[in-house]
Amino acid sequence: MKLLLMLLFSGLMTGCRGNSSSASPPKLLLVSFDGFRADYLQNYEFPHLQNFIKEGVLVEQVKNVFITKTFPNHYSIVTGLYEESHGIVANSMYDVNTKKHFSDHNDKDPFWWNEAVPIWVTNQLQDNRSSAAAMWPGTDVPIHNSTPSYFMNYSPSVSFRERLGNVTTWLSSSNPPVTFATLYWEEPDASGHKYGPEDKENMRRVLEEIDEHIGELVHRLKVLGLWESLNVIITSDHGMTQCSKDRVINLDGCLDPSYYTLIDLTPVAAILPKINKTKVYSKLKVCDPHMNVYLKEDIPARFHYQHSDRIQPIILVADEGWTIVLNKSSLKLGDHGYDNSLPSMNPFLAAHGPAFHKGYKHSSINTVDIYPMMCHILGLKPHPNNGTFGHTKCLLVDQWCINLPEAIGIVIGALLVLTTLTCLIIIMQNRVSGPRPFSRLQLQEDDDDPLIG
């Protein structure tokens, strides 16, 4: 019985190794392939990525933050904060207090980034540690007067191989050692916008290229002797959904352009009214049934998208696959930014290294959960954040973890085993102490007349 209970307990929990003290601090490489939708893993072949997953862990779906855009979600990954908390609320922003504008071509002002502390800054505050980055959004900005010790200014023309070469060189030969590094690549986002995620031929081509990049990454780490000691996380910021010219919401047909300033367009449009806010809201409310219109104070709480001066007074959210346009707007065949509860908007996460289990699959975590997990791996004290470390414990070898579905199965199995053993014991006892052979009882009156004379 004691042995059975021990087996049951060990089955409910994943093993705990503990953080052993080591002369060299742990190292972590964070890689993002922009716009890598979670179900691409089921719909396309990824031999190199699947080998990576077999030797590590896979989170099948990561629920990202609203709005599901590139800059906001990349900052949520490295801060563990919702967009309303870290301040990067869109790819295009306007601050009403300072009158400043932000866009993907005008993103170098630390003002926009200083509302949070990204993990590369925290990492460098530790003794004998440095950080490195290959074009991760924000890493070429002096956030809180600090950039990574090694970084590349953003340029989309720089090849993946060059970015990878720089990052792996920094990880293998820097002093003080690089213990945290990031690597960003624009695909499959660019192709998803151009062709749409349902264009199987073109998407297969770009996804095969990404898989080759992952194979190149693994090979490079093995050549440099980093494969067994370096923790690697591969993830993304958002997914992608199909759009078409038949699913268009034309704002110019609903509202006079002189009534408002458009800060961000689609699929989440940010409206700054020039006239009475209620009048603008009322006109937009009846504009199109495929678009939700919210006053800032009425934005659903589940979006965590209210408490920032950079969120405009009126927000428009298109239904999945619908595009908000002006008369002169161009149309993309694929887009993102929609409701983060849509599976098409969610990415995945895969990880390998000494901190992670091997061959383990987990159904889902949140984007904001990645930050506290990374801090744990690096031994850093995290800044206040919206993530939950407990959501990622099952991925890590040094954490106790109750996996509820497995636990239920094990408990049911254990009860069946106990029931079977109990039945067997009862049957065996009955066999050992079976009925005695019949014998005639010697009665008192028989004493004078014994049976055998």
Curated annotation (Swiss-Prot):
| PANTHER family noted in UniProt | BIS(5'-ADENOSYL)-TRIPHOSPHATASE ENPP4, ECTONUCLEOTIDE PYROPHOSPHATASE/PHOSPHODIESTERASE
Major localization listed first in the record, in broad terms: membrane
> Which Pfam families did the record assign?
Phosphodiest (PF01663)
Question: Would you say which domain of life the source belongs to?
Answer: Eukaryota
Which positions are glycosylated?
N166, N276
Q: Which residues lie on this side of the membrane: Cytoplasmic?
A: 429-453
Q: Give the InterPro entries listed for this entry.
A: Alkaline_phosphatase_core_sf, Phosphodiest/P_Trfase
Q: Which family does it belong to?
A: Belongs to the nucleotide pyrophosphatase/phosphodiesterase family.
Identification of the protein by name: Bis(5'-adenosyl)-triphosphatase ENPP4
Q: Where does substrate bind?
A: N91, Y154, D189
Q: Which Gene3D superfamilies match?
A: 3.30.1360.180, Alkaline Phosphatase, subunit A
Organism source for this protein? Bos taurus
Answer whether the UniProt record assigns the keyword Nucleus to this protein: no
**According to the UniProt record, which cysteines are disulfide-bonded?**
C254-C287, C394-C401
Q: Which residues cross the membrane?
A: 408-428
- Role according to the record: Hydrolyzes extracellular Ap3A into AMP and ADP, and Ap4A into AMP and ATP. Ap3A and Ap4A are diadenosine polyphosphates thought to induce proliferation of vascular smooth muscle cells. Acts as a procoagulant, mediating platelet aggregation at the site of nascent thrombus via release of ADP from Ap3A and activation of ADP receptors.
**Where does this protein hold Zn(2+) 1?**
D34, T70, D237, H238
Q: How is the cofactor bound?
A: Binds 2 Zn(2+) ions per subunit.
Residues the entry annotates as binding Zn(2+) 2: D189, H193, H336
State the UniProt keywords alphabetically: Blood coagulation, Cell membrane, Disulfide bond, Glycoprotein, Hemostasis, Hydrolase, Membrane, Metal-binding, Signal, Transmembrane, Transmembrane helix, Zinc
Q: Does the keyword Disulfide bond apply?
A: yes
Query: Secretion signal: which residues?
Result: 1-18
Q: Which cofactors must be present for this protein to function?
A: Zn(2+)
- GO terms of biological process kind: blood coagulation; positive regulation of blood coagulation; purine ribonucleoside catabolic process
Subcellular location(s) of the protein: Cell membrane
